[in-house]
Amino acid sequence: MPPKKKQTAAAGKDRSKALELAMAQIEKDFGKGAIMRLGDDTRPPIQAISSGNIAINAALGIGGFPRGRVVEIYGPESSGKTTVALHAIAEAQRAGGIAAFVDAEHALDPEYARALGVDTDALLVSQPDTGEQALEIADMLIRSGAIDIIVVDSVAALTPKAEIDGDMGDSHVGLQARLMSQALRKMTGALYQTGTTAIFINQLREKIGVMFGSPETTTGGKALKFYASVRCDIRRIQALKDGQDVVGNRTRLKVVKNKVSPPFKIAEFDILYGEGISREGSIIDLGVETGLIKKSGSWFTYDGDQLGQGKEKAREFLKNNRDLSAELEDRIARELKIGPYAKMKDEQTEEAAGDQMDEDKPIDLSPNFDDDDAN
């Protein structure tokens, strides 16, 4: 028996030595970090670019859209897809990042983007002629390593060159799906290496002859469904009225796929025409949900102070009192463990709250850019 143990130990040493030699050769050929033991990986947790809305950040789980990943936002027409993407661009720019917008639909409204907080002078915009050109431009921008977020609007408008050159009525089966599949194979590695967030906006179509289940599907084949780390389904659920006039939409966003946090969370928020997503409206909704804001009849109260009678008055009050709304947003983030509070335990959260009260200002809810990222 003892000789067998010695042989096993010797064989184990030989295998370990062979593995170390193989790993050394791999690192020599492909660079340091090409292979490692998972326990040796000291990368920080997944960083995020804030969506600009606390309800959406809570639904996404990590405080925003993940950096270095593919995100798909889809829904019916005029449901708020581009609005959500433009708010994310505005937040990235506010944190010192560089943003790009590939406008395949040729429908970007600079005035509306500016109203949402986008720095249109600094925003990189491309209006490509073909789908190949759009994805090639996106790939080159991502590989530059200088872009923090890139939005492609929309996948349905990425028309293959063969379809543009052909005659109306010609059949081009599967061209767009092949185009997306090839592009995403190339892009995903570059996105991870550069920490760029790629948001693909997509449209809905209906499958013919579906008897059971939803007939709805998205364009561009199945590749985007697989490569996306986050998929968001966005829908209008109600019209917001001021008297007889419709002033906006109540919107529901459901995270139907999430590889960085638990999926199937839902965010509801208001989109006001000409203004975008109402930050104050979401603060009121989540404030009531967490118990920080008390609602008695139609009155909203915070720490004994009345915010207003009715949601519109309370929204207006918070809009005119930025410090109070920032304080409330910070307390909600702490309560729901969003953004900088995501990984904290309860006692750490309370300690951070105490430190913050000493400094007498709320912490930045979108601190997901390192100094290196901002440069």
Swiss-Prot record:
One Pfam family, short name: RecA
Gene Ontology MF terms: ATP binding; ATP hydrolysis activity; ATP-dependent DNA damage sensor activity; damaged DNA binding; single-stranded DNA binding
UniProt keyword ATP-binding, yes or no: yes
Keyword DNA repair: yes
Any one GO biological process: DNA repair
Residue spans crossing the bilayer: none
CC annotations in GO: cytosol
Keywords: ATP-binding, Cytoplasm, DNA damage, DNA recombination, DNA repair, DNA-binding, Nucleotide-binding, SOS response
Principal location listed in the UniProt entry: cytoplasm
PANTHER family (UniProt xref): MITOCHONDRIAL DNA REPAIR PROTEIN RECA HOMOLOG-RELATED, RECA
Protein's job: Can catalyze the hydrolysis of ATP in the presence of single-stranded DNA, the ATP-dependent uptake of single-stranded DNA by duplex DNA, and the ATP-dependent hybridization of homologous single-stranded DNAs. It interacts with LexA causing its activation and leading to its autocatalytic cleavage.
Protein name: Protein RecA
Native organism: Corynebacterium jeikeium (strain K411)
Gene: recA
